[in-house]
Amino acid sequence: SDSDALKKLDKKYADFTNNGSVFENLDTKQSVISLSATDICDRWLNPYAQTDIEKGKFKSADGEKEVTYMTSNETYMKTNKATAVMKYFSQTPLKMMVIMPNEGVSLDDYATDFTSLEYTTLLDSVDVTKTAKAKIPEFSVSGDKSAENITQIVEKSGINSSFTADRSRYKNLSRSDDIAFSAMYDIAPSLSINAGGIGGTQSNGDKAELEKRTKELSKTDVTVEFNRPFMFVILDNESDIPLYMGTFTG
């Protein structure tokens, strides 16, 4: 009933994504608009010490760049295509998987072929008795892109009945029997990963690292240095359902 409702919603979501208008293509006469969003801000379960932070080189597509590496002991995973580690957050029931394709495998090719089988193979490869020495660069992902229409992608994934009135099942939302989603949009949020933890629109406390490590890092047989383009996944602790996936290319 509020003719300005869409404008208010647009403003609120634009602030969240550090972007301008994101709902320009929506029809103001549509009666139902459903949004799902998250803004994760947390520190690491095992904090870094200042001695764990050092400068190093990263091999980006544009050549070598200087980055800040964070060194820690992390859960180790591996497939015949990639190497990965898992990090845990202290308050939210989430963890972060960082995945680097093997030498000779481009990130684009790996991401294109990244299937549920590869994902579960990584998770199943965990040996709880072993850890790796992981060197992960601090990085950030900009959320300055406008909303992307992902209707066709969702339909092709098998959830096509949601967009067809005679096949959708949303009767509890209305007295009408012909409700269906007209479109689905995705907006990439801003995200930063550093020694303090993970941050979205809020600061994650980038001064949260310890002045001095109280317990020395364990000696490991494996060292994984994420010094070339990689993927990362924010996933649920218990179900391993991915909530956010992205890439860092330098």
Which residue stretches match the model-derived regions?
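Non-catalytic, conformational "gating/processing" segments within enzyme and secreted inhibitor domains
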Residues: 1-102, 129-214
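Short, solvent-exposed loop/turn and secondary-structure capping segments
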Residues: 45-50, 108-111, 245-246
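Extended hydrophobic
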Residues: 79, 83-99, 217-250
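Internal alpha/beta scaffold segment
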Residues: 101-128
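Short linear sequence elements within intrinsically disordered, low-complexity coil regions
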Residues: 115, 119, 124, 175, ...
